[in-house]
Curated annotation (Swiss-Prot):
Signal peptide: none annotated. Keywords: Decarboxylase, Lyase, Pyridoxal phosphate. It is an enzyme of class 4 (lyase). CDD domains: DOPA_deC_like. Its EC number is 4.1.1.109, 4.1.1.107. This is Phenylacetaldehyde synthase. SUPFAM superfamilies: PLP-dependent transferases. Expressed in roots, rosette leaves, stems, cauline leaves and flowers. L-phenylalanine binds at residues 92, 193, 308, 338. Bifunctional enzyme that catalyzes the decarboxylation of L-phenylalanine to 2-phenylethylamine, which is then oxidized to form 2-phenylacetaldehyde, a constituent of floral scent. 2-phenylacetaldehyde is a precursor of 2-phenylethanol, another constituent of floral scent. Catalyzes both the decarboxylation and deamination of L-dopa to 3,4-dihydroxylphenylacetaldehyde (DHPAA).
Amino acid sequence: MENGSGKVLKPMDSEQLREYGHLMVDFIADYYKTIEDFPVLSQVQPGYLHKLLPDSAPDHPETLDQVLDDVRAKILPGVTHWQSPSFFAYYPSNSSVAGFLGEMLSAGLGIVGFSWVTSPAATELEMIVLDWVAKLLNLPEQFMSKGNGGGVIQGSASEAVLVVLIAARDKVLRSVGKNALEKLVVYSSDQTHSALQKACQIAGIHPENCRVLTTDSSTNYALRPESLQEAVSRDLEAGLIPFFLCANVGTTSSTAVDPLAALGKIANSNGIWFHVDAAYAGSACICPEYRQYIDGVETADSFNMNAHKWFLTNFDCSLLWVKDQDSLTLALSTNPEFLKNKASQANLVVDYKDWQIPLGRRFRSLKLWMVLRLYGSETLKSYIRNHIKLAKEFEQLVSQDPNFEIVTPRIFALVCFRLVPVKDEEKKCNNRNRELLDAVNSSGKLFMSHTALSGKIVLRCAIGAPLTEEKHVKEAWKIIQEEASYLLHK
């Protein structure tokens, strides 16, 4: 293959990599140095980039300097800056030097580790680091790789939930017969992430068989065991087959924590696969004072947390543990002739292709390994505790202002609050909170999001960006107060 100059292309030339790599690292370092100069939420309009880029790809090579100039002028204006210290909209998607270096190393090695033989280190390192994190979380030994359980890295919590739902579905169908699919019933609270709904659609679970159980402020939006028991009993009486329960530790809307032990007891006694989704809050549970929130996980069949949220590991890196790896492999294993090899055929190794939806997989364990080694567990605990401390401070600021109220008790580093309602005018209050959110986000100085709880529009301040300090939290509150004052007096 020749490029425009007649020279044969060498796409991984070591010297060019060294030259361009230095330029790219400098560019990224400068970006982080100046990240506060950008509006946190992109202010562009839909379709903006089509007007700035050509209709077709270049025929001949351009320089990296030209590309980076376009990144500065055309791409960065269309970026919402998730790593900004004033990003409070969603749960964090942490980046770090260690995570970045691990990602770089993974890209540089360029392996595809779908089976042990395709890169033994990729499989074995993944098993080791998932065991490391399981020990930090004090998970039961059944989730460790030395037995029939183990951990695997998925792309997202959505993939993790889909994988275990399919495993649970096939496990019960092997017992009751494949024609019973239309009788299978899934249970969750109305605070469970929409990923479960999508997983049910993919797995062929009829929407009428998805029990979305109502929660309210009396339990801080946690699922009541009584609600689950009543639903399961009704379905059994109707001749249906309860088979899957998804509980939450740190819901997306308000960080509600479901009572795992009580829910697990019901699930276990009825042969229901019990999955615990701790995508966000799982990271905090490496701190002894927050481990209580996953008490009862010993009753679960599977458990997931996102290292790419609050664990300084660049996206994507969702950690899933199961007690019975056979349930996964029986549901997801494929073994065409071109993938057969001695180690796999002899059952001597783990082939992670059979623990996930796709075949191909990146060397994602490298970045998690780098994070654990370059920071250590004690530093990670301090990092998480600092965000929780900042959230406590923000909560106190809100509580001291009579124009605002805290809607749900803060547990981790999310504060749910709103402008207080005018007497008997809840609808007007909701509109006013929407207006406040739009005003704050349009300023470009910070970015927040909202949710709805019991019909109330609630503002969410999720503290967790890697660069966030006390001054950013105080500045955010100052802007919120200023915009609120304008709305209340206009």
